[in-house]
């Protein structure tokens, strides 16, 4: 499988000398479904944001599809960001626009600024958007405003928007943190199925350890900005869990279940 993402010795230190990431190195191949776990403040969100330079690392190198992202700016950075879709916890939709318009926004990186402002999407783009909305079972809501949707529906639209970008890598930052268990399962199923069908690499930050173990082909564990674990769900034993979270796997899953109650 081809390498989509390569990170070498990534460091991130904020101005107040807080170390968010230390010596993170990893590679992710096409089609991998990688869950990043760890307690709050472990560096999960910072790690994802260094990939597309929403957070600029203090040291190290990031490569997307063989091209270095670190230090890139202007047109080069925009071109590289086309290859990376992102799904956020809080949906990142334009609430006053329709579902269809929000999904079409996934094509803005391929358009001129003027065409983007005027909404001059191609007929092919419109057909792709409709097909994606059918795939996420939102085809009957094309012209509903995003503000009229439930949280789970908004996240489905966010997924379609990210896939509309035709990325090689999808970054998902706590996409089910605000959802109930039923909506969470729908969202996780969609992210997994849609990336697997298209051979898109996916890195997803999760607080829910049981969810990570159910879906991921690979799990990365962070604690205090350092990589503690990188392996398969089957290799994630109680000793590793205690090192990452400072508690047992059983206690962690019970506590997470109580948060859903």
Locate each region found by the language model.
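Helix N-cap at the start of a conserved alpha-helix in ABC-type nucleotide-binding domains
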Residues: 181-183
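Helix-to-loop junction immediately C-terminal to a conserved catalytic motif
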Residues: 52
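Catalytic Walker B motif of ABC-type/P-loop ATPase nucleotide-binding domains
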Residues: 170-173
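Conserved catalytic motifs of ABC-family nucleotide-binding domains
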Residues: 166
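Conserved ABC ATPase signature
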Residues: 145-149, 153
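Conserved ABC ATPase "signature" region
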Residues: 68, 116-140
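The feature captures the beta-strand-to-loop junction immediately N-terminal to the Walker
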Residues: 37-39
